[in-house]
């Protein structure tokens, strides 16, 4: 496992930086165009949620190698208010804002591995992985 890049997310322009960084690393490990699009879309949704609901935070990208298998793991960490009901938040249609409620559940479906840890007042940590 190699830490590749850290990006602070504090403004909407930082979401674009996350998208570009994820795409760049996905290309480097030769993910298919479809898999590149999936992880970039998931990362964009999660960075957007982190900014809107968590007040911003930090994104870390890691290139993974396990034997002959390569992957890209992206961590999202914020110190926001946390998510009181994770199961409810992962349901399609759930939103606490003006969005369509597809962010967390949609992001989960786009990646091979998805982990979410959160508690009220403790912030949120989401980790996604896409394998080649």
Language model segments and positions:
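Conserved beta-strand-loop-beta-strand hairpin that lines the nucleotide-binding pocket
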Residues: 1-5, 47-132
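Bergerat-fold GHKL ATPase/HATPase_c domain
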Residues: 1-41
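Hydrophobic alpha-helical segments and their boundary regions
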Residues: 19, 32, 43, 71, ...
């Amino acid at each position: 496992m190699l830490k590749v890049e850290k990006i602070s997310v504090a403004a909407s322009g930082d979401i674009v930086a996350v998208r570009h960084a994820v795409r760049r690393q996905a290309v480097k490990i030769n993910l298919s165009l479809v898999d590149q699009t999936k992880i970039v879309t998931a990362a964009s949704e999660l960075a957007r949620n982190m900014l809107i609901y968590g007040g911003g935070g930090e994104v870390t990208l890691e290139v993974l190698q396990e034997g002959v298998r390569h992957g890209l793991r992206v961590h999202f960490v914020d110190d926001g208010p946390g998510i009181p009901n994770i199961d409810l938040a992962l349901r399609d249609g759930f939103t606490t804002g003006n969005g369509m409620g597809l962010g967390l559940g949609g992001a989960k479906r786009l990646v091979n591995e998805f982990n979410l840890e959160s508690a009220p007042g403790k912030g949120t940590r989401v980790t996604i992985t896409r394998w080649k």
